[in-house]
């Protein structure tokens, strides 16, 4: 099922929407130079983690998945596999799980939580609330 159209607010409709990498970047990764820049950084992070088999799900939220022409950055939630061990990562990949370094080096905001965590549902509920306290959609990207 394709990603839904934007609401009048510029957000996706409430819910967790699914997209593969191709559909995700086709929808959100072009239109302005800033979108292309953010998409390039996001694509790079996906390419770094995909072959490692450590990610169960990738959830994207925030201005990158809105109609906003110039999103400042992308916001990612890495939902890691239960066997995930950050200490086994290369330095290049480890920075993608450090909020300060990921922001500085890739211009992305990151959170991570293990798959099966009792707090995952609560976290997703929180991420789906805008600064104006309205509900918005999130996108789960299938790597």
Walk through the language-model features, giving the residues of each.
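Catalytic core of pol beta-like nucleotidyltransferases
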Residues: 1-59, 65-72, 80-143
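Aromatic/basic-lined ligand-recognition segments
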Residues: 77
């Amino acid at each position: 099922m394709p990603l839904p159209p934007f609401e009048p607010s510029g957000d996706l409709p409430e819910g967790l929407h699914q997209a593969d990498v191709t559909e995700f970047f086709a929808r959100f990764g072009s239109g302005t130079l800033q979108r292309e820049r953010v998409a390039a950084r996001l694509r790079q992070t996906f390419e770094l983690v995909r072959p490692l088999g450590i990610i169960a799900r990738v959830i994207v939220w925030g201005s990158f998945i809105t109609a906003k022409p110039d999103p400042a950055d992308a916001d990612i939630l890495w939902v890691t596999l239960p066997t995930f061990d950050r200490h086994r990562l290369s330095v290049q990949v480890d920075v993608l799980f450090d909020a300060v370094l990921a922001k500085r080096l890739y211009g992305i905001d990151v959170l991570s939580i293990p798959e099966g965590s009792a707090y995952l549902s609560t976290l997703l509920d929180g991420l789906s609330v805008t600064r104006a306290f309205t509900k918005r959609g999130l996108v789960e990207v299938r790597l």
